[in-house]
C-alpha cells in the first residue's frame, strides 16, 4: 500500500469543461493519464460518461474518449496521413462515404489538405502533432485527453489548435483534459488542477488560481500576460488578471 502513488484520490470533471492538470516532474500527471485510459489498473473505480472503465464497456469508451500523447509517432501506422485518418475511423466501424466526408471536414479545419498524401515521416513535428490531434477528434468524441501534446506545435499551429479546441468545447460540448507543465497552455482552460506527489493540492478556476503568486511560489513559471497583469494591478493600472495581451492593451488604452 505504501507504494501507491495515488491514495484517497477523488476527481470529477464536468461535461464540456476545459481542465488543465499541471505539476512538476514526478507529480503523477502522466501516471494519471495512463490510469484514465486503462493502461494502469487502479483500485476503486473510474467512470467515463457514466460507463465503468472495464473490459465490458471498453469499446463504448473508445468511441467517446480520445487520447493524444506527447509522442505523436504512436498515432502513425499508415503510409500516408490520409491512411492514418482512415484507420482511425475504420477502427470505429465507419463506412467509406462517412470516412470521406469526415476526412474532408477535419483536414479543412486543421489545414491538412496539402499533407494528406504525404508520408508521416516527412512531416515536421508540428504537422505530426496537428495530425495526431485531428485524428483524435475526427469522430467527434465527447472527451479529449491531451498529455503533453501541445508543446511540439509552432506558435501559429498552437493558435489554430486552441481556437479549434474552444470551438469543439462550445459547439460540440467537448470535454478537454490538458496535461501540461507549460502554464502558457493553461490560459485556454476553465479550471486548473495542481498535482504534487499524487495529491491534488489546488483545484480552482483559472481566474482564482492566477489571482496571486501561489503557482510561482510552487516553482512554476507564470505566463507572461499573467505576470504582466499582476504587476499592473500593484500599480492600480488593472483591476484583475487578464489572459490575453489584447485584453490588457484594451484596458490600458481603451
Label the model's feature ranges.
Residues 119-123, 127:
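Conserved ABC ATPase signature
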Residues 144-148:
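Catalytic Walker B motif of ABC-type/P-loop ATPase nucleotide-binding domains
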Residues 97-115:
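Conserved ABC ATPase "signature" region
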Residues 44-53, 61-62:
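Conserved ABC transporter NBD signature motif
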Residues 197-198:
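Conserved ABC ATPase "signature" C-loop
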Residues 37:
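Helix-to-loop junction immediately C-terminal to a conserved catalytic motif
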Residues 22-24:
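The feature captures the beta-strand-to-loop junction immediately N-terminal to the Walker
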Amino acid at each position: 500500500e505504501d507504494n501507491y502513488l495515488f491514495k484517497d484520490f477523488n476527481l470529477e470533471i464536468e461535461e464540456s469543461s476545459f481542465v488543465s492538470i499541471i505539476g512538476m516532474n514526478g507529480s503523477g500527471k502522466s501516471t494519471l493519464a495512463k490510469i484514465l485510459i486503462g493502461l494502469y489498473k487502479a483500485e476503486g473505480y473510474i467512470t467515463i460518461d457514466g460507463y465503468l472503465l472495464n473490459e465490458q464497456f471498453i469499446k463504448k469508451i473508445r468511441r467517446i474518449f480520445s487520447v493524444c500523447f506527447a509522442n505523436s509517432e504512436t498515432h502513425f501506422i499508415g503510409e500516408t496521413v490520409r491512411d492514418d485518418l482512415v484507420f482511425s475511423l475504420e477502427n470505429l466501424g465507419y463506412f467509406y462515404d462517412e470516412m470521406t466526408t469526415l476526412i474532408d471536414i477535419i483536414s479543412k479545419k486543421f489545414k491538412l489538405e496539402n499533407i494528406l498524401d504525404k508520408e508521416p515521416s516527412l512531416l515536421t513535428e508540428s504537422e505530426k502533432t496537428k495530425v495526431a490531434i485531428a485524428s483524435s477528434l475526427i469522430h467527434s468524441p465527447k472527451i479529449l485527453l491531451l498529455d503533453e501534446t501541445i508543446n511540439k506545435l509552432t506558435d501559429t499551429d498552437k493558435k489554430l489548435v486552441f481556437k479549434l479546441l474552444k470551438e469543439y468545447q462550445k459547439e460540440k460540448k467537448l470535454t478537454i483534459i490538458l496535461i501540461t507543465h507549460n502554464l502558457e497552455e493553461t490560459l485556454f482552460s476553465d479550471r486548473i488542477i495542481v498535482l504534487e506527489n499524487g495529491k491534488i493540492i489546488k483545484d480552482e478556476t483559472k481566474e482564482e488560481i492566477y489571482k496571486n503568486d501561489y503557482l510561482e511560489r510552487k516553482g512554476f513559471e507564470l505566463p507572461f500576460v499573467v505576470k504582466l497583469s499582476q504587476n499592473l494591478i500593484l500599480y492600480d493600472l488593472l483591476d484583475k488578471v487578464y489572459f490575453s495581451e489584447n485584453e490588457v492593451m484594451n484596458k490600458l488604452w481603451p
